[in-house]
Regions:
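Structural recognition of the beta-strand scaffold that forms the well-ordered cores
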Residues: 30-32, 92-97, 120-123
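Short runs of predominantly hydrophobic/aromatic residues within well-ordered alpha helices
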Residues: 28, 87-90, 117
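Alpha-helical segment that forms one wall of the substrate-binding/catalytic cleft
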Residues: 45-82, 87-105, 109
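Substrate-binding/active-site groove segments that recognize
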Residues: 23-49
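Long, amphipathic alpha-helical surface segments
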Residues: 1-9, 14-20, 26, 35-38, ...
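Short, conserved, surface-exposed binding loops centered on an aromatic residue
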Residues: 21-23, 84-85
Length: 225
């Protein structure tokens, strides 16, 4: 099972897009679309500080890393739930896990697995620390229970050399642009021309040369008196 397009867009909207490393609300060094060292490479500590010189390239890299990360979280959510999930439930659960990393220890998941869906939905709101995530938890709770996806804004935020988010848009993506970035599987190195396609002219084989030889011979013989 995979997160739907609507689920991915909602998750990206919750996380925000930051084209360089920054400290989140609890002091974890983060980059791109909520990417941390715990999720795997690249380590945000190794990325250049501040705004990149090529913003579009950084955005493409952010989406590449996000696609890499989301597979890990999808697999862990599938493993944590013992009962079937609808698409909206799965999308909400992956969003929760992407933010908290605690799908295996969350009480609401155990409650859901025991068969008490209503109580599980209520318990989602036990995860509201820091307070900044309260609105996100409410949106995930609504998505899980009612299948209503939140209205989204896909903002690329500015970031300072001191690794702080500057809440001024550097760019705003449309849903269509974001989905295209998610679908694009072409490595950046290919796009940037690091790998070029070389056209090789085939060497004529004897079979392909023979008609030319015969044609020339007939013309020669036909022209003799």
């Amino acid at each position: 099972m995979q997160v739907s397009d609507k689920g991915l867009i909602a998750l990206i909207s919750h996380e925000g897009i930051v084209p360089g490393p920054y400290y989140d609300s609890v002091g974890v060094l983060t980059a791109y679309i909520g990417h941390t060292k715990a999720a795997g490479p690249p380590d945000p500590a190794t990325l250049p500080w501040g705004m990149p010189s090529d913003l579009d390239k950084a955005i493409k890299e952010a989406f590449r890393v996000f696609k890499q990360d989301i597979k890990k979280y999808e697999a862990e959510v599938i493993k944590a739930f013992k009962k079937p999930l609808t698409q909206n439930e799965f999308d909400a659960a992956v969003s929760f896990h992407y933010n908290t990393g605690k799908i295996h220890s969350a009480a609401w998941v155990r409650t859901f697995n025991s068969g008490n869906r209503a109580a599980a939905i209520e318990q989602i709101m036990n995860w509201t620390k820091p307070i900044e995530v309260t609105a996100r938890r409410q949106a995930e709770q609504t998505l899980f229970s009612l299948g209503i996806y939140p209205k989204t804004s896909l903002t690329v935020w500015q970031v300072s050399p001191s690794r702080k988010v500057i809440w001024k848009p550097a760019k705003v993506l449309t849903t269509e642009e974001a989905l295209k970035l998610l679908e694009d599987e072409t490595p950046l190195s290919v796009k940037e021309g690091e790998k070029k396609t070389t056209t090789v002219t085939p060497t004529p084989t004897p079979a392909s040369v023979l008609p030319l030889i015969l044609s020339s011979l007939f013309k020669f013989l036909g022209g003799r008196k």
